[in-house]
């Protein structure tokens, strides 16, 4: 399945908007002698078309990923553990849709986490953002992320669509009491591949009984 092929759509940080296959094999459409070409562009667009945005031509774009993840969640609600597919493609490993969505969420969350090299992928190679105490823990929500290394690209204030990372964290690590606490605690999140915490989510106290009047 191309969607879960690490040589096509599946990157270490989520799903690409366009298959990396087209890096070396551009798609060419001929319409009455006029050729139009699209290739894999993991970072900023190579043309000024659409203002130079390349959201849907290769980068990791959160609206697309969020729709796919939530759709796979619904598939699991219907199929349960009975249906498994190979993930990643070519790995020989069969997973159900719940396991696949968990891994996809982990990949997306890892964009913002400090990795083994001491860097947050989302800050790319901008030293000030990576190491300056005034910046390093104040995360930005970029418009989209490099399809291969997850460096943040485009506008850095997309608190609408990229902000859905908060809900993905809540869905993956259900112990977070509220979305308001999510981003403050993101630096403490376990690295991808570790087990979810076992501490139960705080329960909501029952309302106090009212006296009869």
Regions found by a protein language model. Give the residues of each.
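Acidic, mature catalytic/reactive cores of soluble proteins
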Residues: 1-213
């Amino acid at each position: 399945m191309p969607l879960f092929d690490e040589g096509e759509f599946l990157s270490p940080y989520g799903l690409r908007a366009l298959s990396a296959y087209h890096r070396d094999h551009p798609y060419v459409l001929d319409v009455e002698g006029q050729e139009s070409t699209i290739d894999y562009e993991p970072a900023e667009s190579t043309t000024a078309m659409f203002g130079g945005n390349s959201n849907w031509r290769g980068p990791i774009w959160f609206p697309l990923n969020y729709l796919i993840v939530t759709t796979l969640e619904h598939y699991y609600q219907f199929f349960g553990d009975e249906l498994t597919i190979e993930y990643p493609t070519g790995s020989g490993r069969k997973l159900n849709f719940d396991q696949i969505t968990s891994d996809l969420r982990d990949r997306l969350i890892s964009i913002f986490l400090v990795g083994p090299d001491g860097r947050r992928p989302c800050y790319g190679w901008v030293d000030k953002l990576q190491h300056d105490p005034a910046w390093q823990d104040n995360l930005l929500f970029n418009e989209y992320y490099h399809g291969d290394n997850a460096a943040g690209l485009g506008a850095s204030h997309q608190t609408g669509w990229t902000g859905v990372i908060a809900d993905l964290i809540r869905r993956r690590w259900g112990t977070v009491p509220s979305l308001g606490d999510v981003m403050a605690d993101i630096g403490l999140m376990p690295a991808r591949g570790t087990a979810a915490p076992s501490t139960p989510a705080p329960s909501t106290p029952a309302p106090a009984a009212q006296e009869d009047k």
